[in-house]
Curated annotation (Swiss-Prot):
GO terms for biological process: gluconeogenesis. This is Phosphoenolpyruvate carboxykinase (ATP). One of its GO terms (cellular component) is cytosol. Pfam families: PEPCK_ATP (PF01293). Coiled coil: none annotated. InterPro entries: PEP_carboxykinase_ATP, PEP_carboxykinase_C, PEP_carboxykinase_N, PEPCK_ATP_CS. Monomer. Binds 1 Mn(2+) ion per subunit. Involved in the gluconeogenesis. Catalyzes the conversion of oxaloacetate (OAA) to phosphoenolpyruvate (PEP) through direct phosphoryl transfer between the nucleoside triphosphate and OAA. HAMAP family: PEPCK_ATP. It comes from Yersinia pestis. The gene is pckA. It is an enzyme of class 4 (lyase). It is found in: Cytoplasm. Substrate binds at R64, Y206, K212, R332.
Amino acid sequence: MSVKGITPQELAAYGIHNVSEIVYNPSYDLLFEEETKPTLEGYERGTLTTTGAIAVDTGIFTGRSPKDKYIVRDAITQDTVWWADQGKGKNDNKPLSQEIWNHLKGLVTEQLSGKRLFVVDTFCGANADTRLQVRFITEVAWQAHFVKNMFIRPSDEELARFEPDFIVMNGAKCTNPQWKEQGLNSENFVAFNLTERMQLIGGTWYGGEMKKGMFSMMNYLLPLKGIASMHCSANVGEKGDVAIFFGLSGTGKTTLSTDPKRKLIGDDEHGWDDDGVFNFEGGCYAKTIKLSEEAEPDIYHAIKRDALLENVVVLADGTVDFNDGSKTENTRVSYPIYHIDNIVKPVSKAGHATKVIFLTADAFGVLPPVSRLTANQTQYHFLSGFTAKLAGTERGVTEPTPTFSACFGAAFLSLHPTQYAEVLVKRMQAVGAQAYLVNTGWNGTGKRISIKDTRAIIDAILNGEIDKAETFTLPIFDLAVPMALPGVNPDILDPRDTYADKAQWQEKAEDLAKRFATNFDKYTDTPAGAALVSAGPKI
């Protein structure tokens, strides 16, 4: 079956004219040639490294630009989007008028017109019933490479009948000179129009804007259909038992979901529908700062031909210095998921989840290493999305910094957070799934809970041992904590026992409880949020 490709007339329908050539769904070999052409300049040019992967730079934008994110406010989105200018919660969903959208679209289409363009047709979502068919249009070869890595690659048969549901036009080279008069944040923009089903990118070269842009759109579309949309990793055991892992950066989400006894469904973005849990993506976007073969062999070995490195330091001989964070600490690599051996094949999906794990790294030394949550506590801790970091390594500086990120991914939520919590718990209740709060952080000893103990805790959750254990109730937080677990140091299960003076735990617990309550206040502007206050800590 022949792949139909795309015509200049189709691009003209988006406002792109006089295209000199269309490179449609290029192969990896062609992309390799295109992005290493000696005539390329600036951020377009890729560098071949000794790993076999190409390295590119994204300029001053080495991460997402949340302050430059906009959504057109119209009849469709007015009463559904969680707007930045409404309610108590802070978020990045700033409203944009149709008039300014038209102006931004004109800038991007003018930038892409008359050029040689790469068009990549992909799927977002591994379940054929609910996936988005996404068309990416860019003039930059490595950006086409990035989306080929990160999204699901259709077969020739699927491409022959491909009809896009969503268009992403990446005009990284263009900026908006009228931003001040229009009341925008800067000359750069990442804008969405849910009526036109389109994303526009201008001014930023960061590849992650395309990945997370479509995640934000799935986060809008799926929950409205009753499908959970989740910022999590997921894996499946030999018996088909599925576990999902939520957690902010530094909590161990990638490490703990990578398990030789279980197959990886995906590492970052998933949906949960009537058939089960499915990956949105066809690749992984892993951090590479201080990467080593010993610590993370799967990621290390995935960096080879067809992988794409971002903002790493490449030495004169082509070797990569993964320890050098001089460009950014957010160095990344994208690669197709099949670069990892132990994955679910041929489609990144599995059955319903039976275990839901919330990972937190509590630097306050208050939370137990593991607790079993009720349905309301599940919603409360999901909405809280808590973790904490130690403030610094200087002597005597021990005040932790708390982070609360709704649904463990506030930056990507398009609807009010309570809608995600409600859908998740409905999915869990339909199949009898159980949630657990796992603390990978610190306790009263001042040391971090060992990876050995944490892995044994995860094993006890996955094999069901934790559900047989006797529990006690931890005061203030009202959490059900096991009294003993196989392979876990019994002295750490009650966090109070890790303090020489238990009054210290009480004092810290009351402090942390107040922080939880202060954070949760923003959800009380909806009936669903107000009803969950009693599931939180009590002072």
